[in-house]
């Protein structure tokens, strides 16, 4: 289903790759043409709203489910959640070598939250534009997958980066943290500057690679869905979109798992004294 009577593939792709943006200077939404204007005081409202909304869904759902937990007659939802928790606990025990009660809950939150954000990619590409076009008589650019927004993925990885710095200083102390920067990998004072440059690059590359890996994989997956929708008529799209959607479920789960595991690994490295 196309958004314009005279279908144009570049315009179709461009429309689906734009965000619903809010101008913070006047608190007004930008229309599709305004999205070409680059402004520092503009935020991707769709990504922020959906990220917060899905986070609240997780909190409320887990809170309500926790009230119904029972040992005698567990329901299917409880069994599923227990399997997820056991899976994450086992990964934390195998990877994280310190003692920290925050790591397991943090890993659970990261895994479930990213999984739900990635899962939005399975919603049909044209569904929301179709609803707005036919019921509200307006065309708005909107992206339903928060993890295809580099601002979201980098923001999450920066939180992990701050935790790395925090636990490095907390466990090793300021002196130990500075030793890691200036005395690794070479202990000779001659290499202080070289060590600092090398370790700084290594430290800063962690959040960058963590955020860009998630963004790149999810963005590429969305691009394939858009190309399938744009190049094929609606009655042929299922031939490619259904197999790709099934395969994409694996990508969705895998990217959530990779982000979680790398977070545990980085925090374990930060908590280990040399």
UniProtKB/Swiss-Prot annotation:
Entry's Gene Ontology molecular function annotations: proton-transporting ATP synthase activity, rotational mechanism
Transmembrane segments: 40-60, 110-130, 149-169, 224-244, 245-265
A GO cellular component entry from the record: proton-transporting ATP synthase complex
Keyword flag Transmembrane: yes
UniProt-listed CDD domains: ATP-synt_Fo_a_6 (cd00310)
Membrane topology qualifier: Multi-pass membrane protein
Superkingdom of this protein's organism: Bacteria
Family matches, as InterPro entries: ATP_syn_F0_a_bact/chloroplast, ATP_synth_F0_asu, ATP_synth_F0_asu_AS, F0_ATP_A_sf
Keyword Membrane: yes
PROSITE patterns: ATPASE_A
UniProt keyword annotations, A-Z: ATP synthesis, Cell membrane, CF(0), Hydrogen ion transport, Ion transport, Membrane, Transmembrane, Transmembrane helix, Transport
Biological processes, Gene Ontology terms: proton motive force-driven plasma membrane ATP synthesis
Compartments reported by the entry: Cell membrane
Cited Pfam families: ATP-synt_A (PF00119)
Function: Key component of the proton channel; it plays a direct role in the translocation of protons across the membrane.
Family: Belongs to the ATPase A chain family.
Oligomeric and partner information: F-type ATPases have 2 components, CF(1) - the catalytic core - and CF(0) - the membrane proton channel. CF(1) has five subunits: alpha(3), beta(3), gamma(1), delta(1), epsilon(1). CF(0) has three main subunits: a(1), b(2) and c(9-12). The alpha and beta chains form an alternating ring which encloses part of the gamma chain. CF(1) is attached to CF(0) by a central stalk formed by the gamma and epsilon chains, while a peripheral stalk is formed by the delta and b chains.
Record-given protein name: ATP synthase subunit a
Organism (species): Buchnera aphidicola subsp. Baizongia pistaciae (strain Bp)
Organismal lineage: Bacteria, Pseudomonadati, Pseudomonadota, Gammaproteobacteria, Enterobacterales
């Amino acid at each position: 289903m196309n958004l314009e009577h005279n279908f144009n593939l570049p315009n179709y792709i461009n429309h689906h790759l734009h965000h619903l943006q809010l101008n913070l200077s006047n608190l007004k939404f930008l229309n599709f043409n305004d999205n070409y204007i680059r402004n520092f005081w503009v935020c991707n409202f769709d990504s922020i709203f959906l990220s917060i909304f899905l986070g609240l869904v997780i909190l409320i759902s887990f809170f309500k489910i926790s009230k119904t937990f029972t040992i005698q007659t567990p329901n299917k939802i409880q069994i599923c959640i227990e399997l997820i928790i056991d899976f994450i606990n086992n990964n934390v025990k195998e990877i994280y070598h310190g003692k920290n009660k925050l790591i397991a809950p943090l890993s659970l939150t990261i895994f479930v939250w990213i999984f739900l954000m990635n899962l939005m990619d399975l919603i049909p590409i044209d569904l929301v534009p179709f609803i707005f076009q036919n019921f509200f008589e307006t065309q708005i650019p909107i992206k339903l997958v928060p993890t295809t927004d580099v601002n979201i993925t980098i923001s999450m990885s920066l939180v992990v980066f701050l935790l790395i710095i925090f636990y490095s200083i907390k466990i090793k102390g300021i002196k130990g943290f500075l030793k890691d920067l200036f005395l690794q990998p070479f202990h000779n004072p001659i290499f202080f500057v070289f060590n600092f440059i090398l370790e700084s690059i290594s430290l800063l590359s962690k959040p960058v690679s963590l955020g860009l890996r998630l963004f790149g994989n999810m963005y590429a997956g969305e691009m394939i869905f858009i190309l399938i929708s744009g190049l094929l008529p609606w009655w042929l799209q299922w031939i490619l979109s259904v197999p790709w959607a099934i395969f994409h479920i694996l990508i969705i789960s895998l990217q959530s798992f990779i982000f979680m595991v790398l977070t545990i690994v980085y925090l374990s490295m930060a908590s280990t004294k040399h």
